[in-house]
Amino acid sequence: TQADAQKQTTSITEKALKVNDLLAVADQRVNDTIVFQGPVKHTCSHSGRRCFISDPTDETTIRVEVGGNIKSFNRELVNSEIAVTGVLKEQRFSKEYIDKWEKELKEEEAKGEKDEAHCDSEKNSILKMREWMKKNNKDAYVIYYVEGIDYDIVK
């Protein structure tokens, strides 16, 4: 019934973490099934295979990949509040990986294989990763994302 569905959604959203709360404990929750919620900032319009859930300031996002009962994310979800159930994953970029990326970028730039705007964007990403690693005394830059299982639109 609709009342049962509403109760289920309410119980999901009551235990759902906000983006910043999830990121604060992410290193301890990798490979755990988690529930979090927030507004959809962006959906990938070509494939619909991922969306990005933001914190209240729109400065921090977590990527959600399709999986489980989620077949795609449609554009109509943008600006909707959703509660996502999924498995928290991490992608690690070691210092060595970043060094190699930077070297390859410089070589491509020297050969004229990439346009300036693309190179500037990648250089900025590399710089931000290095700054974060230095500030946090880490030997790798970690990006957390969620392999989706299901989601509910929060009323």
Each language-model region and where it sits:
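OB-fold and OB-like single-stranded nucleic-acid-recognition modules
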Residues: 1-155
